[in-house]
């Protein structure tokens, strides 16, 4: 199972370095994204000048299963803050990790180097 951070999804959409790695992982079965991270993707697409319809269409094309943020994930994301504060992880980042915690064999796919070495997580950097 792969859990995608918004940075890896945006790399695919914008064909940034690492897009090939992220796209290959995304095309495998059981690729997930938290609804919070999808919201980050949509926001970035709008920042880049896409219309609401274009941003929604781009997200619909992604072979990812969107997982709504649950109460348990929200709590877990909050509990991750003390251990990730020094790495500069955002709320969205912690929601991604909280989703991954629910799937013990999950690989977290990101382009964010500060995630490397986070205890208890299998992190795959795309670049």
Q: How would you label these PLM feature ranges?
A:
Residues 65-107:
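Active-site neighborhoods of divalent-metal-dependent phosphate/nucleic-acid chemistry enzymes
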Residues 27, 62, 119-121:
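Short, structured coil segments at secondary-structure junctions
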Residues 1-33, 45-57:
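Short, well-structured N-terminal submotif of metal-dependent ribonuclease cores
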Residues 8-9, 37, 73, 95-96, ...:
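Alpha-helix capping/helix-boundary segments
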Residues 2-5, 33-35, 89-91, 112, ...:
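Histidine- and aromatic-rich ligand-binding microenvironments
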Residues 19, 38, 52, 74-77, ...:
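A general structural signal for well-ordered alpha-helical segments in protein cores
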Residues 1, 97-127:
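Acidic, PIN/NYN-like endoribonuclease modules and their adjacent C-terminal/linker elements
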């Amino acid at each position: 199972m792969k859990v995608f951070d918004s940075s890896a999804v945006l790399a695919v959409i914008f064909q940034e370095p690492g897009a090939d790695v992220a796209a290959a992982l995304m095309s495998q079965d059981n690729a997930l994204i938290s609804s919070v991270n999808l919201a980050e993707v949509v926001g970035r697409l709008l920042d880049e000048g896409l219309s609401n319809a274009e941003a929604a269409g781009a997200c619909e094309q992604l072979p990812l299963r969107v997982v709504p943020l649950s109460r348990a994930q929200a709590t877990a994301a909050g509990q991750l803050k003390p251990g990730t504060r020094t790495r500069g992880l955002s709320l969205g980042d912690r929601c991604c990790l909280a989703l991954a915690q629910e799937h013990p064999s999950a690989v977290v796919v990101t382009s964010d180097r500060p995630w490397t070495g986070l205890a208890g997580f299998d992190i795959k950097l795309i670049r």
